[in-house]
Amino acid sequence: MNNEAVVEESISKPKSSKLKIAMIIGMLVVLICGYMVYSFNNNYMYNGKIANNVFVEDVNISLMTKEEAIALVNQNYKTEALSLIYNGKTFKILPEDIDLKYNVEEVVNSAYNYTKTDSYFENVKRLFQLEKANQNFTLENSFDEAKLSESLESIAEKINVPVKNAKLYISGGSFNVTPSTTGKEFDVGANKESIYEAINSRKYGEVSLKVNDINPKISTSMAKSVDTLLAQHSTTFSTSIAGRAENIKVSSNRISDVLLMPGEVYSYNNLTGIRTIANGYYNAPVIVNGDLEDAPGGGVCQTSTTLYNAVLYSGLKVEQVKNHSITSSYAPRGKDAMVNDSGSDLKFSNPYDHPIYVKSIVNGGTLTCQIYGNSADKPNVDIRIDTFPMGAKTYRIFKDASGNKIKTEYITTSVYKK
């Protein structure tokens, strides 16, 4: 019995020793692993530095603090001034003018946190991946669009040149031309695109500006092409009726010195304006429903009629004309042109390849309307009036230089109450 107890005791002692040894070894393994993890974390993950083999663009920021990395990237990637070139002049836009900058801090923060995510195992995975391949982060630039627009507007003001049409003034048979000026216009859209491209490609050197030429509607040569009198017509009026005489002067002045380009339409009413006292007209006799009564603007129809006859003989295209309700004292039937503020207007257009010039002159009690143009456009015209009991039909006959009829053009039919 005692011998058996001794045997059991001798058997249990080796087992207990092995267990103790295993426990000691296990504790050592845990301690070593813990130390390795602690050391790994301190040296690689939570050491306050960026992991190895991390780049921003082509700048190696491995094992740097964020502050060190930001300083190094800023040193290598600086925004520069834009030099905008036009006609030998340079216009500078500085980075601070438009808040132009790279997102360096944002990118460095991303690089720093690349191995510092919320997942420990993801961080370990990334660290091991970095031993095989680099991790590259890309910079992006930004700028204030509104400030760029302001800078370009300021430059445009220094470059833009207003376009100026040539001006023609005829007086006493003398032709005086003020030359035209070609305008210059800064192309905002195209120049913005060029600047975007320079910024995005990081080529901050010189940017050629696009400036467009703006041609005048009326060039000097066009104005100078008016070189002769095509036709003119005169009527007389009494200066003793002061209001009427003044209205003729006012309307004559407003329709005069107008250069009409090829295809353009001339409107008598648009030029003379509404007939009111406030608009500079005087009370004078006017025809209303076949009777005479005083109203502002009396007499302006004599101006429109005088101009109409000059238009007929100059070969211009009659677009709109209407006769009076009664035969006027200053023009035969078929040759008068009534205007009012209710839509009756005298309109004509320029059918020629050159401009025409309208001149109206009052000299004492005589009103003269003249149409000037190019000598090549001077027509040979007769006006034919076919009368009937209550009116007349107006025709224009075009002839060649030898007096041979080229064509007959119907103009209008006029009907009168009396």
Summary of predicted features, one role per range:
Residues M1-L19:
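N-terminal Lys/Arg-rich, disordered targeting/topogenic segments
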Residues N2-N3, S154, P162, Y169-S171, ...:
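Well-ordered beta-sheet/strand-loop patches within structured domains
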Residues V37-A51:
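Aromatic-capped interface at the extracytoplasmic side
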Residues K66, I70-N74, V108, E145, ...:
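Extracytoplasmic/secreted envelope proteins and their assembly/folding machinery
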